Amino acid sequence: GSGEILKLSAAAFTGPDKKIVTANPTFESIARHASVAGADVVKIDLASDYSHDLKKMLAAANGAGLVYICNPNNPTASITPAKEIADFLGKLSPATIVLVDEAYHHYVESKDYESVIPLVKDYPHLMVARTFSKIYGMAGLRCGYCVTQTGNIRRLRNHQAFDSVNIMALVA
């Protein structure tokens, strides 16, 4: 579903001179795509409570093209509160894109969780990936979407093939 967004983000925002910072463990797809793009992959271990260690991720993000936060995290199901992500965004260089992958947001029942989509209007360097694959049972259709500001969409589109979304997914 959102795999295309992860692939395009790695192509658009990482490379030999732009590393990616991600958690460990987390969903590995984007790290693989960034590695193919020639980027250094910096993995920051989760904190002892399995949350993202945003302080260490911030320290590692100097010169990064992309920071990836899977929220809720896959495979740990840990969540990072939106306020903590907002604080992180405020401290991070606006030249570094933050991609928050909310593929499993439909399954969260914790009162501590909220989507970061409302933050997109205030943070031009924030992108949020979502998928229809999980809750809607559309895994085979490979359809997802990205919420971000226009400039980031333009950069993604520069790397997108004309047929990256199949006709069945578009109809669905």
Each language-model region and where it sits:
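Conserved core of the PLP fold type I
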Residues: 1-93, 104-122, 127
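Bulky hydrophobic/aromatic packing residues
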Residues: 52, 68-70, 97, 154, ...
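Short beta-strand/loop segment that forms part of the nucleotide-sugar
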Residues: 98-103
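PLP-dependent aminotransferase class I/II
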Residues: 125-172
